[in-house]
Amino acid sequence: MSRYLGSITKKSRRYGFSLLETEREFIKGKKRTYAPGQHGNKRVKLSGYGEQLQEKQKMMYLYGLNDRQFRRTFVIAKHMKGALTLNTFIALESRLDNLVYRMGFAPTRRAARQLVNHGHILLDGKKVTIPSCMVKLEQTIEVAPKSKDLPIVAAGASNTPCKFVDSDLKTKKGKYVRFPERDELPEGINEAYVVEWFNRLV
């Protein structure tokens, strides 16, 4: 399955969950805030399998991954010490593209991935073009000097950097200082269902 490149707003409505983490998709006055489709405003009771699949899909779309990438990230989480439920989130949050977004250097994860792909991001002073690169604690991330004035970078300044990163929005340089705690991560996802889903496959 390839990475989803369609409307994030539609997917947010489908799952009743803000994939942009801003609730912008559900602002009063929007044409539709319920799920897309002819019967989108009708709730359907899901089976246990359906609930697991839905939570997996929500997390996958939130971080902008395809199935293969998500499964690979889950395998990384399984080899980490601690609770697998939290480690699944930590592995996702430790991706380079996600941390570029968390530091306020890009307005969305999709934009952050684009910056990494095009060589605008440095990791410990070296250009890295792999969005899935797993960043270690205390590593530094910065926008390349020639890229700091890009509109897409300026747009990221509206994001408040998370507490688990040390970010300077003026110099466009930051550090991954600690792993996030559960209350610092997106609400509305049952990660236990995600773990149950992948445990059947991995």
Curated annotation (Swiss-Prot):
Gene3D superfamilies in UniProt: Ribosomal Protein S4 Delta 41, Chain A, domain 1, RNA-binding S4 domain
InterPro entries, per the entry: Ribosomal_uS4, Ribosomal_uS4_bac-type, Ribosomal_uS4_CS, Ribosomal_uS4_N, S4_RNA-bd, S4_RNA-bd_sf
Protein name: Small ribosomal subunit protein uS4
Record domain S4 RNA-binding: where: 94-157
Any one GO cellular component localisation term in the record: small ribosomal subunit
Keyword flag Ribosomal protein: yes
Keywords: Ribonucleoprotein, Ribosomal protein, RNA-binding, rRNA-binding
